[in-house]
Amino acid sequence: MHVIGLISGTSVDGIDAALVDLSGTSLDLQVELLAAHTYPYSEPVRSQIISLCKGEAIPLAELALLDEAIAQEFAQAALEIQQGQPAAELIGSHGQTVYHRPVIGNTPAYTLQLGRGAIIAQQTGLPTITNFRVADTNAGGEGAPLVSRIDICLFSHPQQRRCVQNIGGIANLTYLPPLSDVAQIGVGVQGWDTGPGNSLLDLAVQYLSGGRQAYDDKGNWAAQGTPCQALVEQWLSHPYFEQAPPKSTGRELFGWDYLQTCLRDAEPYHLSAEDFLATLTELTAASIVLNYRQFLPALPDQVLLCGGGVRNHYLKQRLATLLTPIPVLSTNEVGLSADAKEAIAFAVLGYWRYLGLPGNVPAVTGARREVLLGELHTYP
């Protein structure tokens, strides 16, 4: 089945689209990537999303218009990714997260993604699955991470323990025990958000460059600096890093306000811009490793990286150094595009919903049971 996956992550760097040919349903899942591309948001839409993610208030009427505008741009991405390719039969669209509240005591998680599925279905003429996270939160889960079931199907190894480490705006992991140890799908699998990924680094670059630079290309700016280990240790004492999984987070915790805290913490050290950025990059790498050492049943035999962080060579180098001697590869090296992996994942989740198959892993999200993820919109 030809399916389009669409997502814009917490970095808000554009709409990632993937057109894939899918077959199989579980460990027999086969994925062929036919096309992948990132389509930048129009600047007015991107600016509004970033303002909203910073916690700035906007009138309800503007929120409604933004919801529709995001859907229009997602629909356009779905139309463009099909050019010169086989026609798609289905769309799985994550939308744009603008708010995520994890489970807090007896208060359930809440998550809000914009980009109406009905509009995407109408504009493309394709059945569209959206709003994937709500069924999991309604079952008592965090609503995140949702990619773990895909990771099980695509990256499980007969003998090796693997960690699939996504570094998007927020970093998250899936721990996969050897298949020889798994009696049924999901048993022994763990996953959670480890903490900040690219979005905090992007915010820092935008602040330090006075808005002239959106992100640290290949990590070259941070690579010119030296991490302040005292600051890294201070930041690693944040309660989130000590919280046992299942857990999830977002810009609400590691966003603009957190960056301002980090800048204040750094003042006594008189760091250069390069040193500050190197220190923040070290926080992302060190927090990932801390999560492994604190909460995994055993360290992995291999780490597979995916997401935009794969393009940050300095971050990848620091993570590999901190994990020595564990090999750190990208999913490119085992046959799946690291850049397109999240878009591929939501194509698969949409496909499973269309087939009436569950998409969450309760051991990862904390949900009480497996559930069908997403809402189906058809047109006409």
Curated annotation (Swiss-Prot):
Gene Ontology molecular function, alphabetical: ATP binding; kinase activity; phosphotransferase activity, alcohol group as acceptor
In the UniProt record, does the keyword Nucleotide-binding occur?
yes
Could you state one GO biological process linked to this protein?
amino sugar metabolic process
Q: Which pathway does the UniProt entry assign to this protein?
A: Amino-sugar metabolism; 1,6-anhydro-N-acetylmuramate degradation; Cell wall biogenesis; peptidoglycan recycling
EC code: 2.7.1.170
HAMAP family cross-referenced by the UniProt entry: AnhMurNAc_kinase
Tell me yes or no: is Transferase among this UniProt entry's keywords. yes
Q: Which family does it belong to?
A: Belongs to the anhydro-N-acetylmuramic acid kinase family.
Positions that bind ATP: 9-16
Catalysis performed (reactions): 1,6-anhydro-N-acetyl-beta-muramate + ATP + H2O = N-acetyl-D-muramate 6-phosphate + ADP + H(+)
Q: What class of enzyme is it?
A: transferase
Per UniProt, which keywords does this protein have? ATP-binding, Carbohydrate metabolism, Kinase, Nucleotide-binding, Transferase
Domain of life here? Bacteria
Q: What does this protein do?
A: Catalyzes the specific phosphorylation of 1,6-anhydro-N-acetylmuramic acid (anhMurNAc) with the simultaneous cleavage of the 1,6-anhydro ring, generating MurNAc-6-P. Is required for the utilization of anhMurNAc either imported from the medium or derived from its own cell wall murein, and thus plays a role in cell wall recycling.
- What is the recorded name of this protein? Anhydro-N-acetylmuramic acid kinase
